[in-house]
Structure formats: structure tokens, C-alpha cells
Amino acid sequence: MQQEALSFLSSSLPSLHHNFPSLSRLRFNNFPALSFKPNTSSSSSSFFKSPDIPSLSSTTTTTTTTETLESSIHEKLIYLDSLGIDFLTLINRHPPLLSTALSAVESVVDYMTTPPINFTLQDFRRLVSMCPELLTSPLTSHTIPVITFLLREVGVDSIFDLRQALRRRPRLLACSVDHQLRPTLYFLQRIGILDPHKHTYLLSCSVDNKLVPRIDYFEKLGFSRRSATAMFKRFPQLFNYSIAENYEPKLKYLMVEMGRDVREVLEFPQYFSFSLENRIKPRHEACAAKGVRFPLPVMLKTNEAGFRDTLEVCCDSSPPLKTSRLVTVQKDS
């Protein structure tokens, strides 16, 4: 299995705005151009035909529409600016905000910043900066159903926990309950994650494009489907890590530089949560210099002072007690 995993890793390759004009350019030139058409008739009454000039009523209607639109945009700019939200930055990232009625925007702001939801303005600004769709999503047919789903179906315990979940993953507010959130919830429950309220950040992830491919990756390393799934059940945060930027380099270091069995990550999938450069490599090199090999949890989970103390105790001439966690430590010959 180790050779199969190494072969797979060595052959794998790393995988890897809307620009909207400023307000000063928001003008509409809908006036038809004057036309000049020579009269080819032989009639002597007129050599030239009079230019086609738009009627006064058409010009007035166009002007009124333009002025109304600009007035609406200006009102939204002033309103959002009063909340500390940069309107021009938002429309550059999310142009539909331009055509959203001010009353609809105000309704969303009121709902999210007053009881029972009761986000502070600072928190609300952060939500909007990360999820501008919040301001343009229909309140009654989208935003409220998302909130209701999180509280009733996912089992988020309280409004406080709801705010925490949305602070951590504002994109939840842009997701469809029927097409995104509920299918992902069912998938997580099906693989044995029975406390989804603790992992709401995963609900915005695509099952087909993100969750399943990560389980498949460990199957290709030689793990059974059951073992790979159990690893994600034990440590659901593993779904959030990149295959190319996290799994692959850390597994290569584990097997090639550390000389460990790939199956160690089955029991300690938290291995992938530690920085390769700042934690894994320095700890391994310190152990190698002393000629010892710790279990991965002992090597990585303790703070720096605790790790150094453990290393010194292990290298002492007196053996550890049988009840000590160091009894599993292997000393390299």
C-alpha cells in the first residue's frame, strides 16, 4: 500500500470582475441621432427631406427614465455609505446591486441587524463584503429560508450560534436551500457526520466538485472507501483542504522524508491541519537529530515548550513509565 501511495503521489501533477463604470460614467445616451436623407424624387416642391426629429414626448420619457435611475443609484449610495459600506466597490464585484430596489436593500439590512438576528453593523459590513449577494437576494424567498434551514434542519442551537456560523461562512447566505445546502447536509449525514451544526461551513461546498473528489483521492492512495470515509468522519475539516496544496506535499513529506506509513493518517487525519514548514518539518528534524520517532499526535499536537520537554525526557537515560504516552516512542537505531 505504501508503494502504491508513493507511486500515485509521484505521478500526480499539482492542480492548480465584473468591472463596472464609476458613477460619473453612469449616463445613458438613448437619444436617436438626427438623420439627413436627400429626396430622390423629381418633385420640384422640395429638394431635401426634413430631418427625422424625435417627438417631444419620446425625449421627455427617456430623460425621465435616466433621471429616475440615477436618482435611485444615488439614494442607494447615500444609504449604504451611512452604514459604512462602499457602494462603488460592491457594484464592481456584484453589478446586480445597481438594479435592486432601495426598499429591498433596506429590508435585508433591517432583518439582519435587528432582533432576533441582531448582527452588529460591523459584522453586517463584513458579511456583505464577503457575500454581496446578501443585499440582492429576495428576503422572503431566499434569505429567511436559509436562516430557517440552519436553525431547524441543521440543528444550529441558538441565534448566537447562528451568528457564529454566518460569521465563519458568509457564503451560506448565497446558497440555495434546495439545490446546495440540503443535498450537502444529506451527504454529510450519510457518511456518518451526525453533528452537522458543528460543521456548517461545509454546507456551502459542492458534493460532486469538492467533497467526493477528496474521498476519491485517498481511495487512489490505496485506502478502502470505508477507511477513507471514516477519516473524514473523524476529522470533517479535512474536506476544506486543497488536494494539490495540502494533501500531496504533506503526504510526500510523511512517506519520503519521514519514512512513515501512509496509514498513520487514518488514525491522525489532523496531521493535515498543521503547517508543513512551520510545524511538521521542524518537529521531524528535531526528532531526527535526537534519533527518536514520536507518534504523530505526540510530535505535532503539543506546544513548542511541551514538545521540547518531551524530547528531552525521551532522550534521558531513564526509561518512561508504562503509563506514559512516551511508551510508544521508538528510538531509531
Curated annotation (Swiss-Prot):
The keyword Plastid applies. GO terms for cellular component: chloroplast; chloroplast nucleoid; chloroplast stroma. The keyword Glycoprotein does not apply. Gene3D superfamilies: Transcription termination factor 3, mitochondrial. One of its GO terms (biological process) is embryonic morphogenesis. It is found in: Plastid, Chloroplast stroma; Plastid, Chloroplast stroma, Chloroplast nucleoid. Keywords: Chloroplast, Plastid, Transcription, Transcription regulation, Transcription termination, Transit peptide. Residues 38-67 are annotated as: Disordered. Its main location: plastid. Residues 1-55 form a transit peptide. Pfam families: mTERF. Expressed in green aerial tissues such as cotyledons, leaves, flowers and siliques, but not in roots. SMART domains: Mterf (SM00733). GO terms for molecular function: double-stranded DNA binding; plastid PEP RNA polymerase core enzyme binding. Disruption phenotype: Embryo lethal arrested at the globular stage. Seedling-lethal with albino phenotype due to defects in chloroplast development, photosystem assembly, and associated with an accumulation of photosynthetic proteins. Self-interacts. Associates with the plastid-encoded RNA polymerase (PEP) complex. Interacts directly with PTAC7/PAP12, PTAC12/HMR/PAP5 and PTAC14/PAP7. Transcription termination factor required for chloroplast gene expression and protein synthesis in chloroplasts. Necessary for chloroplast photosynthetic complexes assembly by modulating the accumulation of photosynthetic proteins. Essential for embryogenesis. PANTHER family: CGI-12 PROTEIN-RELATED, OS03G0360600 PROTEIN. Belongs to the mTERF family. This is Protein SEEDLING LETHAL 1, chloroplastic. The lineage of its organism: Eukaryota, Viridiplantae, Streptophyta, Embryophyta, Tracheophyta.
